[in-house]
Amino acid sequence: MAKVKEALEELRPFTDLGACTFAESETEDKDWINNWKQYFKPFTVDHILIKPTWETVPEEHKDKLLIQIDPGTAFGTGMHETTQLCIRQLEKYVTPDSEVLDVGTGSGILGITALKLGAKHVFGTDLDENAITAVGENLEANGIAPEQFKVVQGNIIDDKTVQNEVKYEYYDIAVANILADVIIMLQKEIPVHIKKNGIFITSGIIDMKEEAVKAAFEANDAFEIVEITHQGEWVSVTARKK
């Protein structure tokens, strides 16, 4: 604490630090990496059962399509409304021939859902290198061959290497459960990667951002909005490439 105070005092001539009061407390020693697991329980999205890898399948859900997920340090348990909105849209559009692009893949839950629904192949991108490990582990947990789901680290919006690796005019479906502001940027890039009449499923959009996302899609001559769905305060916008 003394070193922190000394460092702040060195900054005082350059900025207004105010009173600079300090509080010190002890935090209970817990396994924070794994402690969240007690809150992740099996749940359903329509006819799909999503469960953590360490839980058993509830007897009443044995007839449902099973997806097992352990996100590790990547994002995505499936419990959030935005993920569920995307899953419901994937149910509508995935076919046995679908090539799927999963942007911001995280744990791989959306890509794995697409494969479980019958998609041919998934290509995922994520800024977090942990996503590559998480997806690999979750593919194994779901009995899916690793060659069915490739993941690369990088930003598809502005990284030409990633854009080239993703391929052009290739995908039947793109899905992105990110943030509204990122989707507004992403909708400019995605059209070059999906086929004509390809579907772009988006969520991560809080209701107060719905109009901004709609306006961005409507201003893009490459897309037409085909559906907007809601769950709680969250929104999914689905568009088709013209």
Across the structure, where does each feature detected by a protein language model lie?
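Conserved SAM/SAH cofactor-binding pocket of Class I
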Residues: 73-156
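Hydrophobic residues in well-ordered beta-strands that form the structural core
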Residues: 51-52, 124, 202
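Amphipathic, non-transmembrane alpha-helical secondary structure
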Residues: 5, 84-87, 91, 184-188
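S-adenosylmethionine
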Residues: 127-241
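Conserved beta-strand segments of alpha/beta enzyme cores
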Residues: 21-23, 49, 121, 148-150, ...
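A short, charged helix-loop
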Residues: 63-71
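N-terminal auxiliary segments of SAM/dcSAM-dependent transferases
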Residues: 1-60
